Structures are given as C-alpha cells and as structure tokens.
C-alpha cells in the first residue's frame, strides 16, 4: 500500500517482535511480507522495523523531511540494527538520528502490561542529535510513570549511543582457538531440576551441570 505524501511521518506501529509475528499475523501474511522485502533481508526484524525502513527511504530520497517512531526497545540490538545501519553507518550518512530515547517505560494498550520502548527521530544528512537516557523512574498510579532523562549531544550511532563506535570493533585474532564465550542458555526451559537431570542421565549422559562466574565466588 502506498503511503500518502507527507512532510513529517509520526507513528506508533504494532509492537510485534520477530518471534511473535507468525502468532499475531499468520504464516501467510509473514511469508508474503518477507518475500516482498526480500532484498533487505528482513527475516530477523521486529514488525515495526518495516515502518522505520520505509520512512528512512522516503526521508533519504527527499520525499519527507523527518520521521519519528515509537518502537520496541530492541531497535538498537543486533538483528534490528541491521535495518538502521544502511542509512546511518555508511560513508554518506544519508539519514541521521536527531533525537532518541533508547529505553523508556510504556504500558501496552492491548493488555495493560508494562513494556519497554524506544523513541527515534531521523532526518536527511549527517547531523548530530540529542540522546536522552532514563536515569530515574517512579510509578505515580496505575497508569502513569514519572520519568527523568539526561541529555547528551553528538552523533547518534545505530546502537543508539554517542561516542566511540564499538560496532566497528573486530574480533582479536590472538584470541582465536584459545578464548570461548561458553554455553549460553536460550531460555528458562533449558534449566532442569537435579531430580529430572538424574532421571535423564539414568538412560544416557545427556544433561551436564553448567557453572558461570557467579558459581565460582
């Protein structure tokens, strides 16, 4: 669907994470959506990033002056960041974020659940922006949260930070084959009780204990 012409684009697109898109939209819709955007490799994006990308294209091409969205706060994480980087991390910096709050409290209108969101405003060209980080939150009543933020001015990077661009860091060759990140559990479902582990291992050596730094104090 073609968007109507506008100088400014403002929105609060649906909060559907990548893993929940099929549940909320259905397999057919998700497959058709990803096929239509195939050249941008969007399979790991949250639903809201399709809006962000399209608005960024309009601003880059001079068809809109500026856009601002409320999005999931995972916008600055690795998979969603791939949507931002073609606009922000290239030599020409075709689009710049001029205002951002990376992590802000929010109440989901669908079920009243407390969630975290991000806010971004972008315009064409290489421009510095204002980054506001939340440093204090206070619940006033069932529907309101008082929030205090501190501003920083500078070039806002795709990870919604200002300063050294750690996204350009490369792996240390000296660590190759001698350093490992180790095991990371993908969710609470991977944790089992000692009793269940013993019953599993009665048949085969399938479950092993995992320790991290917190267990070695």
Language model features with spans:
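C-terminal target-recognition/interaction regions appended to catalytic cores
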Residues: 199-217
